[in-house]
């Protein structure tokens, strides 16, 4: 039978079960129909209000959401709703109404209709802070032509291949220093290995990496004694993400008017982020003015932006602030999840290591060449982001009316792609709970079509994508060459939503060095 309110297109390919007749798998696993091979309706599209929904009372919906799931489990809330309503549903939480989709065919229709200046959901407390305190904004919060102008200029220095090749030595140096940190700890432990939670170390690694790429300078975050001011910046980023969650579905002005601790902590976090980013940028600018601009070596993204007249200094500062704020927790979390999956899947880890060692030998140590010889390693990053995406959804406001699943979705509607639910859906991924990077190497496009969404899609995909991909790949190359990574407990650590998806509890790794001589140095 059909799920309530679902059009004929929602029937699975002949011989398969319908959406709701499928058994739940694991923690709320579900089976949804694919667009391919499904029946296509020839009738007029159904109206928007017929899309399956829990009801139009946003505040009542929000109450049930808080009581039954909670904001920190919103990713599981999506999974449960797709199980209940089918592959498309609409939900109003508070005063925000969205249409949610999961099928890659629908995702393709959505992104292919996004227009030249796509708009996504803007985090309400971020907007409130920037507006109330009159902070400059970059591409993260800009719209339309203003966004386009900044994005085009930034793409040339952040996304273009001729620019990103300059990042390799900067990122490799930081990764090698991280390896040295672990070797020092193994030596200090005196047990031939090191065990512990390295999440704070990964935050510092990510901060050291992004600042080296932006400023062309090291901040000393991997030294024995850590710069306390830089650590304040890292802590502020975490606090900014964490305090955003309670204000996603309630007006941030309420938190501000009642002077809640959540709002005060959120403001304090942003104040630190802006203050530190401004100091970094201003110091770099004045040093450049004093020493001149004659340099043969690459000096980082900021140097290139300042040498170009396409952006004002205020716009440059705003965008540098956003890149710094967005380049720490996001990358470090993905690396932590990747180490976690490698430690739980030692055969996969051995395959990745064999590929890296062969690439090192063939490339004779040249990192640029090595990066072309590790397709499985790159696929493993995609696989990590499938199981553990940073964002719980991707969002677009429709530019024009769009028909999805035979429903007419009006222009300006917020449509969200539930990428956590998509990544763990057995209809779209065979054996979805299994960490299998080889699935991304398939030549069958139907297996990967609009499924690799960890960095978003299109012209508004993650600005730092190329930096993050290089940073993570180079980090993993160095780690695989130097250590075998194991985990003390193989059970699932769980996932929690703190604006980004994070491990629910600390992960303790054990690192076994291959080169004992390096450990003794």
Curated annotation (Swiss-Prot):
Pathway(s): Lipid metabolism; C21-steroid hormone metabolism; Steroid metabolism; cholesterol metabolism
Effect annotated for changing residue 141 to W: In AICSR; reduced activity
Name of the gene: CYP11A1
Gene Ontology MF annotations: cholesterol monooxygenase (side-chain-cleaving) activity; heme binding; iron ion binding
Keyword Ribonucleoprotein: no
Induction per the UniProt record: By 8-bromo cyclic AMP.
Cofactor(s) in the UniProt record: heme
Family (UniProt): Belongs to the cytochrome P450 family.
Highest taxon, organism lineage: Eukaryota
Disulfide bonds: none
Species whose genome carries this gene: Homo sapiens (Human)
Function: A cytochrome P450 monooxygenase that catalyzes the side-chain hydroxylation and cleavage of cholesterol to pregnenolone, the precursor of most steroid hormones. Catalyzes three sequential oxidation reactions of cholesterol, namely the hydroxylation at C22 followed with the hydroxylation at C20 to yield 20R,22R-hydroxycholesterol that is further cleaved between C20 and C22 to yield the C21-steroid pregnenolone and 4-methylpentanal. Mechanistically, uses molecular oxygen inserting one oxygen atom into a substrate and reducing the second into a water molecule.
SUPFAM superfamilies according to UniProt: Cytochrome P450
Subunit structure of this chain's protein: Interacts with FDX1/adrenodoxin.
Name this protein carries in UniProt: Cholesterol side-chain cleavage enzyme, mitochondrial
Disease with which this protein is associated in UniProt: Adrenal insufficiency, congenital, with 46,XY sex reversal: A rare disorder that can present as acute adrenal insufficiency in infancy or childhood. ACTH and plasma renin activity are elevated and adrenal steroids are inappropriately low or absent; the 46,XY patients have female external genitalia, sometimes with clitoromegaly. The phenotypic spectrum ranges from prematurity, complete underandrogenization, and severe early-onset adrenal failure to term birth with clitoromegaly and later-onset adrenal failure.
GO terms, biological process: C21-steroid hormone biosynthetic process; cellular response to peptide hormone stimulus; cholesterol metabolic process; cortisol metabolic process; glucocorticoid biosynthetic process; sterol metabolic process; vitamin D metabolic process
Swiss-Prot/TrEMBL keywords: Cholesterol metabolism, Disease variant, Heme, Iron, Lipid biosynthesis, Lipid metabolism, Membrane, Metal-binding, Mitochondrion, Mitochondrion inner membrane, Monooxygenase, Oxidoreductase, Steroid biosynthesis, Steroid metabolism, Steroidogenesis, Sterol metabolism, Transit peptide
Entries under InterPro entries matching the protein: CYP11_CYP27_families (IPR050479), Cyt_P450 (IPR001128), Cyt_P450_CS (IPR017972), Cyt_P450_E_grp-I (IPR002401), Cyt_P450_sf (IPR036396)
């Amino acid at each position: 039978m059909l799920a309530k309110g679902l059009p004929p297109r929602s029937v699975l390919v002949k011989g398969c079960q319908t959406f709701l007749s499928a058994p739940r798998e694991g923690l709320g696993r579900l089976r949804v129909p694919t667009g391919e091979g499904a029946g296509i309706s020839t009738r007029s599209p159904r109206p928007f209000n017929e899309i399956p929904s829990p009801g139009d009372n946003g505040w009542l919906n929000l109450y049930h959401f808080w009581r039954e799931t909670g904001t920190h489990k919103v990713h599981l809330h999506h999974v449960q709703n797709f199980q209940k309503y089918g592959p498309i549903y609409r939900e109003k939480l508070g005063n925000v109404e969205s249409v949610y989709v999961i099928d890659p065919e629908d995702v393709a229709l959505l992104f292919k209709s996004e227009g030249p200046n796509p708009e996504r959901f803007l985090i309400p407390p971020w907007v409130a802070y920037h507006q109330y305190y009159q902070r400059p904004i970059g591409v993260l919060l800009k719209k339309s032509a203003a966004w386009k102008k900044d994005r085009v200029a930034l793409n040339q220095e952040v996304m273009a291949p001729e620019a990103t090749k300059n990042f390799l030595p900067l990122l490799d140096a930081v990764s090698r220093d991280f390896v040295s940190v672990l070797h020092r700890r193994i030596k200090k432990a005196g047990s031939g290995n090191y065990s512990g939670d390295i999440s704070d170390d990964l935050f510092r690694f990510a901060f050291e990496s992004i600042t080296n790429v932006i400023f062309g300078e090291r901040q000393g975050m991997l030294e024995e004694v850590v710069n306390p001011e830089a650590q304040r910046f890292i802590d502020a980023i975490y606090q900014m993400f964490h305090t955003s969650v309670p204000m996603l579905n309630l007006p941030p002005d309420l938190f501000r008017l009642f002077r809640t601790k959540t709002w005060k902590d959120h403001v304090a976090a942003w104040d630190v982020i802006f203050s530190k980013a401004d100091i970094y940028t201003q110091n770099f600018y004045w040093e450049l003015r004093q020493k001149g601009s004659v340099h043969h070596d690459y000096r980082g993204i900021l140097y290139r932006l300042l040498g170009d007249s396409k952006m004002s200094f205020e716009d440059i500062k705003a965008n540098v602030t956003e890149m710094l704020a967005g380049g720490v927790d996001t990358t470090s979390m993905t690396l932590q999840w990747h180490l976690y999956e490698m430690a739980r899947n030692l055969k996969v880890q051995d395959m990745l290591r064999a590929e890296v060692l062969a690439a090192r030998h063939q490339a004779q140590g040249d990192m640029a060449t090595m990066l072309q010889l590790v397709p499985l390693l790159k696929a493993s990053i995609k696989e990590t982001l499938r199981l553990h995406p940073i964002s719980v959804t991707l969002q677009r406001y429709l530019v024009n009316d769009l028909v999805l699943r035979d429903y007419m979705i009006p222009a300006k509607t917020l449509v969200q792609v539930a990428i956590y639910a998509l990544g763990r859906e057995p209809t779209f991924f065979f054996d979805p709970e299994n960490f299998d990077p080889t699935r991304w190497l398939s030549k069958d496009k139907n297996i990967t079509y609009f499924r690799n969404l960890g960095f978003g899609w299109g012209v508004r995909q993650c600005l730092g994508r190329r930096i993050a991909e290089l940073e993570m790949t180079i980090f993993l190359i160095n780690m695989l060459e130097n250590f075998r990574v194991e985990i003390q407990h193989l059970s699932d650590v769980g996932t929690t939503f703190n604006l980004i998806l994070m491990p629910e509890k600390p992960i303790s790794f054990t690192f076994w060095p291959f080169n004992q001589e390096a450990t003794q140095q």
